[in-house]
């Protein structure tokens, strides 16, 4: 009786609402007072235009109780429950007219959606009391389930997302296991890439195998479309192998025979300039002179002296090379004469060649004109004598245990006498 009374009060209170609120699609709320312990508010969902309804012919037209009604087909209901309800509603043909109100209320409550609450509000107390108690309990259970389903929508979305991720991970795991099982014949199977392509490319089947690298290289933004033109290098055709072939020294000496005179003239001018600057430095730029003019004179004299030494060095090098060519030419002529005479050619050693060069040098000094040639020869001989004497002295000191050589120990070290200890050193 408590359930019927609460249902009656709820329908009566909901009937006072305006039709405008019904059109706006607001949900009707019902208070379920079945139990004494707790009270629950049940939300009813509005009717959608595209929902499926089936007209019931019995009592729809020509009935004394009022207009027709529509039945909502709920796909969530079980087949057994629908069959049982159909059997209870249509099982008794004799009480069909009397239980018309009961069937109408039962269908609306059984669907779980109280969409025609304004029709139920017009029912009398007798019509509400005629509904069986178990059907009211069933309607309350269905409405609770619908309400719980609406509140759990967000949780279901989260659970659905997590389930999708779990299924995806499970599929990846199965694919990997299938790949490993298919390549189980090899000793060290090559695993497919899991995290990144770089780690997969860096992996190798064997430690001695070459590293695998990607052939895709990024194109540089600074591309050199047109190559720069190389600067033309100047070349002298007189000494170029493309035009003149190998250099003929004899032909070159004959063609440029005037160059030695120019070299001698240049050296003479540098010597005169150096002597003049040296006299000027003595008179105007002494060692104590600190003026700017004195510094300029010193710098100019040092520069001319450096140029003179460089010119003399180049001239001495040219003279030495000319002397070597002359000595080689003499040996070549001698070998040609020996071959013509039927003798074997003579190939001098390095020491013999150096001796011939030294003899040639002294002959040139002796053949000079005037007293200067004899003086230069005498100076050269004295310089050679001093050099040889210094060599003999070093070799004699080394033999006696002195000198700068350390590979030969002194004679006194070979004596049997013990060496004296240093001061303060214990024996």
From Swiss-Prot:
According to the record, the residues making up region (Disordered) are 1-100, 146-165, 178-219, 280-343, 364-427
Compositional bias of type Acidic residues: which residue ranges?
A: 34-54, 74-99
Highest taxon of the lineage:
Eukaryota
Q: In which residue ranges is the amino acid composition biased (Basic and acidic residues)?
A: 296-341, 406-419
A single GO BP annotation from the record? maturation of SSU-rRNA from tricistronic rRNA transcript (SSU-rRNA, 5.8S rRNA, LSU-rRNA)
**Does this UniProt record's set of keywords contain Transmembrane?**
no
GO CC, sorted alphabetically, is: 90S preribosome; nucleolus
Q: Which family does it belong to?
A: Belongs to the RRP36 family.
Protein function: Component of the 90S pre-ribosome involved in the maturation of rRNAs. Required for early cleavages of the pre-RNAs in the 40S ribosomal subunit maturation pathway.
Name by which UniProt lists this protein = rRNA biogenesis protein RRP36
Q: Which organism is it from?
A: Malassezia globosa (strain ATCC MYA-4612 / CBS 7966)
Instruction: Name the gene.
Output: RRP36
């Amino acid at each position: 009786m408590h359930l019927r009374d609460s249902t009656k009060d709820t329908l009566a209170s909901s009937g006072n609402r305006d039709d405008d609120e019904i059109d706006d699609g607001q949900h009707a709320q019902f208070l379920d007072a079945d139990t004494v312990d707790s009270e629950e508010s049940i939300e009813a969902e509005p009717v959608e235009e595209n929902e499926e309804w089936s007209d019931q012919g019995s009592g729809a037209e020509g009935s004394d109780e009022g207009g027709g009604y529509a039945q909502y087909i709920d796909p969530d209901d079980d087949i057994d429950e629908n069959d049982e309800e159909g059997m209870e509603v249509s099982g008794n043909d004799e009480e069909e007219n009397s239980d018309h109100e009961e069937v109408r209320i039962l269908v609306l409550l059984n669907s779980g959606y109280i969409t025609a609450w304004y029709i139920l509000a017009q029912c009398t107390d007798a019509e509400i009391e005629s509904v069986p108690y178990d059907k009211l309990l069933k309607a309350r259970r269905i409405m609770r389930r619908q309400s719980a389903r609406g509140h759990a929508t967000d949780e279901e979305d989260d659970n659905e997302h997590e389930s999708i991720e779990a299924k995806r991970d499970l599929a990846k795991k199965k694919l990997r296991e299938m790949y490993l099982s298919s390549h189980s014949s090899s000793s060290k199977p090559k695993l497919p890439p899991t995290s990144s392509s770089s780690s997969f490319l860096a992996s190798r089947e064997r430690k001695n195998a070459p590293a695998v690298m990607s052939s895709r290289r990024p194109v540089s933004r600074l591309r050199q479309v047109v190559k720069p033109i190389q600067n033309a290098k100047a070349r002298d055709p007189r000494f170029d192998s493309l035009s003149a072939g190998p250099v003929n020294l004899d032909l070159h000496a004959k063609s440029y025979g005037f160059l030695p005179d120019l070299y001698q003239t240049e050296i003479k001018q540098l010597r005169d300039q150096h002597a003049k600057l040296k006299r000027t430095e003595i008179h105007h730029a002494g060692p104590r002179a600190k003026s700017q003019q004195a510094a300029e004179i010193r710098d100019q004299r040092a520069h001319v002296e450096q140029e003179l030494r460089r010119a003399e060095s180049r001239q001495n090098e040219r003279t030495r090379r000319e002397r070597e060519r002359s000595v080689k030419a003499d040996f070549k002529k001698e070998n040609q004469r020996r071959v013509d005479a039927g003798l074997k050619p003579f190939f001098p050693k390095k020491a013999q060649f150096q001796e011939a060069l030294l003899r040639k040098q002294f002959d040139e000094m002796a053949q000079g004109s005037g007293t200067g040639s004899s003086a230069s020869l005498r100076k050269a001989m004295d310089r050679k004598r001093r050099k040889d004497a210094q060599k003999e002295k070093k070799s004699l000191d080394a033999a006696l245990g002195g000198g700068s050589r350390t590979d030969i120990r002194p004679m006194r070290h070979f004596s049997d006498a013990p060496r004296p200890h240093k001061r303060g050193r214990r024996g």
